[in-house]
Amino acid sequence: MAKFEIKEEFYLDGKPFKILSGAIQYFRLHPDQWRDTLYNLKALGFNTVETYIPWALHEPQEGQFQAEGMLDFEAYFKLVEEMGLYLIVRPTPYICAEFDFGGLPAWLLRYPSMRLRVNHPLFLEKVSHFYDWLFPKLLPYQSDQGGPILMMQVENEYGSYAEDKAYMRSIAQMMKVRGVTVPLFTSDGTWIEALESGTLIEDDIFVTGNFGSQPKENTDNLRAFMERYGKKWPLMCTEFWDGWFSRWSEEIVRREAEDLAQDVKEMLQLGSMNLFLLRGGTNFGFISGCSARKSKDLPQITSYDFDAPITEWGQPTEKYYAVQRVTHEVFPELEQMEPISRQAKAYGSFPLLGTANLLDVAADITEEILLDYPQPMEQIGQNHGYILYRSDIKNQYHEERLKALETHDRCHFYVNQEHLATQYREEIGDEMLFSADTERIQIDVLVENMGRVNYGYKLGAPSQSKGVKGGIMINHQFRKGWKHYALKFDKEMLAKLDCYSAPPEKVKAPTFYRFEAELNDIADTFIDCSKYGKGCISVNGFNLGRYWNEGPIHYLYVPSGLLKEKNEFIVFETENVKIEELTLLDHPVYKK
C-alpha cells in the first residue's frame, strides 16, 4: 500500500517522486502486445503509464457494459502492477483522444434535450450510471488500496470547451462519493483563459498542463497561475505531445527526433511529464475521430501511429532512443534496458474466393426496419458504420429528381442497383436527375459515418448525428416509406454474410470480397490497400478499420493476436473497384 501526496513536490511513501510517464492506451492495442509495450516504457527508465477509459467502448448501448478482451482494463492494470509500474487514469466522460465523439457514446444523441459536458441533469444522469459500473472496478487499484493508480483526472481540457464549474464539481463529487481517494487533477492548455475555466484549483484539485514544446514558457504559465491562488504544487505536463494525428487526404504529420529530445530534456529538468503517446495504436473498427475547420469536417485515419517513439506496430524509432538518451542525461541513476522490437511478416497474395452485392444481401445480414421517413443511425440503435435506406417508387416521369438533405457524412445513390452518384461535404443536397425503363424503381441511399468531431465547438453540432436527418426528396416531395438497414460490421453481421458468388464483370454496387489465408509462423502483417478504393476490412470477424485511396495511408495493420492458421478476410468496397486479390506485407504502405 503506497501513499501518494502532492505538496511542493510529489511524494511517494514520504519520499520525493518524479513522475516519468508514457501514454499507452490499452483499447488501441491487442492485449498480446500490452506486456512488451509496458516493458519498453520501463526500458526508457520511466515509472508510470497513463491511459484514458473510453465511455463509448465500455457502454456501447445504454445500460449494456463490456470489459472483455481489448477492453479488459483490469487485466491491463494488473499487468502494470506486476511490472512494478504506476498508473495515471483518466476516467472522464469526455476524452478527446482523436476518438469518435471524443469518447462519448453516440446513443446520447438520441435525446433531443441532451446538453453535453455541462451541468445538465440528463447528461449527469447518464454519466452517473456509467460511473456506477466503472468505479467499483477501479477502486481496488488505487495506490492507497495497494494498487498502482496514483491519480485520476476530472474532465479533460475543459477550459477549451466551457466554463461550467458546477459541472466540473459534479464530476469530481461523483468520483469522490463512489470512493475515489487518490488525488484528482485537471489538464488544460496553459493560457490563462483555459486554466481559469478548466480547473478546480479553488477546490484544491491539482492543476496540470498539456503542451508539446516550449516547456519553459508553458511551465512558467502554470507556475504563475498556481501562485495566483497561493499554490506551490509541482509542475506537471499531462500530455507532452511527441507527435500528432493525421487526417485523410493530408500528409502524415512528423516531428524530428532531436527536436523532441531537447524539449523532453528541458521538461524533465523542470518537472514531471507524461509522454503523449509513448506508443501509437490503431483506430480499430470505426473509432477514429474527426477534426473541424469552420464548416468542413476532416476525418482522421485508421492508424493512430501519432509519429510516437514506438510505432503503431510496436517498433522503437529514432525518437525512442533519443528520449532514452536524454532521460539518462538528466537521471543517470535510472536503470534502462534495450527495448523489444516486433517484427512483421509478408505472406504474399491470396486469390478471391467469392463476392456479395450489398444491395442483394442487406436484408439477410441485418434487420430491416420500415419507417415513414429516414432516421439518423442513432435513432435505430446504431453508433458507427454505414446505413442503407431503400424505397420503391412508381416510375411516373421521363426524368426523375432526387436529393438528400442534412445527410452525413458520405452518400452513394443507386437506381435499380446502378450507381447514380456519390456526394460528400458541400455536394450533399445537390439535385440529381435519373431515368429508368422499369415500372417500379428501387432507390438505395448508402450513407457512411466517417467519424464524429472529437474536439471543440462542434462536439454538439447537428452534424454529429449520422445518416439522413433532413429527409430524401424525389420529384420535389419528401418521399414516405423507407427501409433502414444498419450496417455495423460487427461479428454478428459478418457471421450472416454469404459471400460465395462469382464476381460480376463490372462492379456497379457496394461489394463484399472474401479471401482465405492459411498462414504458418504467425506474425504481425499489413494489408496492402493501394489498389483498393474505399471501405473497410475484417479478419476473422474483427473489424480492422477503414481504408481510402485518398491516403496518406494505403495499409491496414493486422496484429498477430487476431490471426490463426486459417483466416477469413472480408473486404467491403464502396467505390465500384473490382478487387481480385489480398496481399499481406511486412511493412506499411503510404500514398506516393
Regions found by a protein language model. Name each.
Residues 146-228:
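Gly/Pro-rich turn-and-neighbor structural signature
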Residues 17, 420-421, 544-545:
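Short hydrophobic beta-strand segments in globular cytosolic domains
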Residues 19-21, 48-50, 84-88, 147-153, ...:
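Structural preference for beta-strand elements that scaffold enzyme active sites
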Residues 1-35, 39-43, 58, 64, ...:
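Extended substrate-binding grooves/exosites of carbohydrate-active enzymes
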Residues 399-414, 443, 517-540, 547-548, ...:
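Aromatic-lined ligand-binding clefts that engage carbohydrates, nucleic acids, or primary amines
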Residues 391, 428-432, 513-515, 552-556:
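Short strand-edge motifs at loop-to-beta-strand transitions and within beta-strands
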Residues 383-392, 508-518:
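Short beta-strands within extracellular/lumenal beta-sheet-rich domains
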Residues 123-153, 164-165, 172, 180-181, ...:
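Carbohydrate-binding surfaces of carbohydrate-active enzymes
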